Each structure stands twice: as structure tokens, then as C-alpha cells.
Amino acid sequence: MGRTRKANVCRRLSRRALGFYARDAGVVQRTNLGILRALVCQESTKFKNVWTTHSKSPIAYERGRIYFDNYRCCVSSVASEPRKLYEMPKCSKSEKIEDALLWECPVGDILPDPSDYKSSLIALTAHNWLLRISATTGEVLEKIYLASYCKFRYLSWDTPQEVIAVKSAQNKGSAAARQAGTSPPVLLYLAVFRVLPFSLVGILEINKKVFENVTDATLSHGILIVMYSSGLVRLYSFQAIIEQFMQQKLDLGCACSQGGTTGTVGEAPFGIPCNVKITDSPPPLFEVSSLENAFQIGGHPWHYIITPNKKKQKGVFHICALKDNSLAKNGIQEMECCSLESDWIYFHPDASGRIIHVGPNQVKVLKLSEVENDSSQHQISEDFVIWAKREDRKENLITVTASGRVVKRNVSLLDDDPEQETFKIVDYEDELDLLSVVAVTQIDAEGKAHLDFHCNEYGTLLKSIPLVESWDVTYSHEVYFDRDLVLHIEQKPNRVFSCYVYQMVCDPGEEEEAVNRSG
């Protein structure tokens, strides 16, 4: 068969205007994103640094919005210059927002208020208030006072866009108690809510008397994950815990009595009492031992990734079947590299069941498949590898002995040698189906970085974008690629934060040539 020609962007736009893709909304959306991907990756397209700003407080990014001053000020990243969407009133240090999640309206749901159909920011303040804020105006739409018996600090999705978990800081006890060798029985609390409108699932305490040498706990997809100092990780059904150990059902806005005090649930100063207290160790759904409690689940069918619980095994990853703990064929992955920084591995966020393994000079995309003639066993194989652009060179060290003899020694450089191109960040842009890879090279005194876009299916390099600012490898960096936007957030010493915004533009040089030709 002959090679299939791809329709160019102009032809696809013309066909869309004539209604060729109008049979369902999904087709139109995919067509639009296909057109945008073609524009992003074409050779003439450039990404220009349109503005840069600096701040003394952390900078956050969520879906086209940049947040400054602990989420108090919101700026659009779409405009070619900073355009303020809103600024909330100044507040005291105790009222500042410490963590936030962006909530977006579910498709097809009937909601109680017109404002509910617009995006909201779910925010946690330093003084334990949970807020729902309009992402458009900054207006506070809902507020809940959590409690005074602990300090809540972290927000995460249990079920994305449906259920949130609010996690407290760990209770270390007083300095005097620590010196005496005693510690409080409750390590931390987890408050769980359904969103829009807020409704309480429950507040759970993680008690050392039940979980013994517990070091941390979190909630994800209805699973309570408990980590222990021995490296053990145990998974429990959160729903089963709620059904067995909930002491009383609490509803926000309703009267409640607790410990001789009466108040309204979710209002200050009463807050929300802890109403889920585990008294006996529940049966775990699953348990495994892993170095530093590192544990991930993913793939089709379900597999998990761990590092054997021995220090000398650091950098060795085992991929095992969840159903019977059997090691996949070729399931031991170890990147042969000599570097100061560890390589890392995770399940691909594109829901393909693949695995991404990142080292200083290579990005391996691995696939999980059935073993031929044995459907009960699965194997790991390479799908593709992205290599850093490097010279194969060795350092010659010359030593002169006491007798005057010259001795040459060849010493191989580290794989994350700063003078060689090194991978620092790997991410996935789901709408355009592109892998984005940040590579950094130290040139003289400063580092230079570029962001590369690779085909998610084959790993082919489609586009490379140089970042104009220098890249110091000792600083903390975040890079976001969102449709036609690239955002680089950098944290420098002394809590100085910088934000560099790049937008997709046509090459001005090519525009001038086109004008000259037309004249």
C-alpha cells in the first residue's frame, strides 16, 4: 500500500468549517487538538518568552492560571502580558492559603447553584478553614471550619474531582515529652469530603496503638495506605473502615454534642469532631515491604513497582503482579548508570499501562504484555528509548611518578556530569499526546535547558524549545507544558521565586519573508 498523506492544517480547518467533523463533540475536540498539535510541532512555530516575574512567596500554576502570594492573587497566563483576574483582600499570616486544588464542573450533573457550573479553587488556610473559591472572581462560595485539635496542612484528591482528603501535620508531641521518650498516640488525622456541595464523609485518626510503628498514611482511590518504619506498606479499604469504626454520622451545618460541648458541625469554634476511630487492626487488602516505603500500582492487569527493602538495592525496581505477587518476566529493572542523582520510575499517566523509567541520559518507555503461550504471566519489554545527545568521551588523568614515568589513566565521567546533556524532568501532555522532556547542559558557569516534545507512541523527537533563562541545577524547578503555553517556575535561595512564561508564536523572520515575497 502507498503511504497515506496527512491533510494539512488549512485543509482540516476547512473541513471542520463545512461540518465534516460535527457528528459528535468528541470528534470535533479530537480534531481541534490534532490541529493544535500540528501547529505546535511544525518547524516554523516558536515559543517566545513573553514575560517574566519574581515573587517572595511560592508561585503555583493550574490550567491557564498563575497564583501568587499564597493564592491571593490570580493572573491569566493566556495574555502576552500579565493580566490580573482577581486579587483577594490582604489577610493575616494565620489566614493565608497553604494548599489548594482546582475543581472543575462535572459534565452532565445538575448542580444546586449557577456558580457551581464554573471552576472553583478548593483551598486550605493556615488556621484550618476549608474554602471553595470562585476561580474566576476570587469570591468565597463555601467555607468550613475543620477543627482546633490538630493542624491541617495538605490537600489531595482521593477520587479526582469528586472526593478530597485533608491531611494534618504529624503530631510530634511537646519537646519535654520527646525528651522523656513518650509520644502522643495519634500520629495524624485525615478529613474526607465529597465536593460540590461539600459533604462530610468522616475524620479518621491514625493511632499508633492500632498501627504501631506507623510513620505516615494517605488516602487514594478509596484505599487507605499506611506506611511503617520497617518499610512495610499496607493497604486497607477506607469504605470498610468507615462502616465498621464510624462512631457517629455528622452532617455539616447540623447541631452536635461532643465531650460536653455543643456546636454546629463545620462552624467555628466547634469545627468537626473526629468521628472515625479504629479500635482494632482491620484486615489489610494487601501488604508489601519496600525500601523507603516506595510503592506504586498501575498497568493492565494491575501490577506494582517496589524496590527491595535493602539499602544496597537502591535503584533496583521490581515489577510484580498484584494478584499473586509474581515477578513479571524481565521485571527487574536496573538502569546501568553512574550518577549522583537516582533514576526514577512510574506508571505512564496516559492509562496505556506502560512504564516510564528515567535516568540521567535516557528515558525508557516499557510495555507490559502477556507472555506468548502463557496468558497468566506477563513480561516487560522496551517500547522505545529516548537518549540524551552526548559525546562518548573519557577524562585522561596524567600522573608523573617519582622516577619521572608518565602514567595515563582513563576515568569515565559520571552519567549526570553537568557538562553533558542530562534529563531533569519528564512529563506527559494528555490533550496533545506528547511526552515533554527537559534536558540541561552546563556551559561554562551557567546551565542551559531545552524542552523537547516527543511522540508518545514512538518516541520520535518532534520539537525542541530552548529556554532563554539560565538553569541552575542546585535550584528547585517546575516546568509546565499546557497546549500552547510553556511555564517555568524556579525557586532560588532565600525564598525567591521566578516565573518565566512562553507562548506559541509564528517566527517573525518567516513573517517578514512572507511579506517581502508578497510585495
Curated annotation (Swiss-Prot):
Keywords, ordered alphabetically: Membrane, Nucleus, Transmembrane, Transmembrane helix, Ubl conjugation pathway
Regions annotated as coiled coil: none
Subcellular location: Membrane; Nucleus, Nucleolus
UniProt main location, coarse: membrane
Transmembrane region(s): 186-206, 222-242
A GO CC term assigned to this protein in UniProt: Cul4-RING E3 ubiquitin ligase complex
Cross-referenced Pfam families: DCAF17
Tissue: Ubiquitously expressed in the embryo, with higher expression in brain, liver and skin tissues.
Keyword DNA-binding: no
Involved pathway(s): Protein modification; protein ubiquitination
Topology of the protein relative to the lipid bilayer: Multi-pass membrane protein
A GO biological-process term: acrosome assembly
Subunit structure: Interacts with DDB1, CUL4A and CUL4B.
Function: May function as a substrate receptor for CUL4-DDB1 E3 ubiquitin-protein ligase complex.
Name this polypeptide is given: DDB1- and CUL4-associated factor 17
Organism: Mus musculus
Gene: Dcaf17
